[in-house]
């Protein structure tokens, strides 16, 4: 087990990170370690670098200490998941990604799944099979809700509709008030 060190640019440009290895004693040595990802390639792939102080699992290619690889990160009592995901449950439905700033991509992995993207300020996109709706809401109280009842647009202040061409409104009944 290693601990990600303070950021230093990789002197060889190999996308490595400094990792302290406490197993080496009171003054743990640091190694440069490459970072394993589920998908990585030129100009594409996952990019989720651990933060300074995160616990990581370190392996060594062919047992060579010069070829360290961060294989994953670890949770513990001192390094718990973000609030919404801190408590495990038997159902294990709550999944997610939470960034350092609190931005979230979340999943409720139930029979009728829910997917959401949310910012710390309260802007949110919700895809909800349970409530059978798609909702876009913002921190100001504006919303766009699509569900079996139709489409509802709510503006906390003014509402402007602009088109470079024609605007057509049609329906069985139109109520403008």
Place the predicted regions along the sequence by residue:
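Structural signature for extended repeat/solenoid scaffolds and their inter-repeat hinge/linker regions
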Residues: 1-162, 167-170, 176
């Amino acid at each position: 087990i290693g601990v990600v060190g303070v950021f230093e640019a990789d002197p060889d440009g190999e996308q490595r990170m400094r990792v302290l290895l406490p197993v080496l004693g009171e003054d743990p040595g640091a190694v440069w370690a490459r970072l394993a990802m589920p998908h990585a390639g030129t100009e594409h792939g996952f990019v989720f670098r651990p933060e300074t102080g995160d616990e990581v699992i370190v392996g060594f290619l062919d047992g060579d200490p010069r070829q360290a690889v961060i294989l994953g990160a670890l949770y513990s009592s001192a390094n718990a998941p973000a609030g919404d995901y801190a408590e495990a449950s038997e159902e294990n439905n709550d999944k997610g990604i939470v960034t350092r700033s609190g931005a979230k991509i979340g999943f409720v992995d139930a029979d009728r799944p829910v997917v959401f993207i949310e910012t710390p300020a309260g802007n949110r996109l919700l895809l909800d099979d349970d409530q059978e709706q798609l909702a876009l809401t913002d921190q100001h109280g504006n919303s766009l809700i699509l569900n079996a009842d139709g489409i509802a647009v709510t503006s906390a202040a003014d509402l402007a509709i602009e088109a470079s061409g024609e605007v057509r409104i049609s329906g069985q009944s139109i109520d403008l008030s």
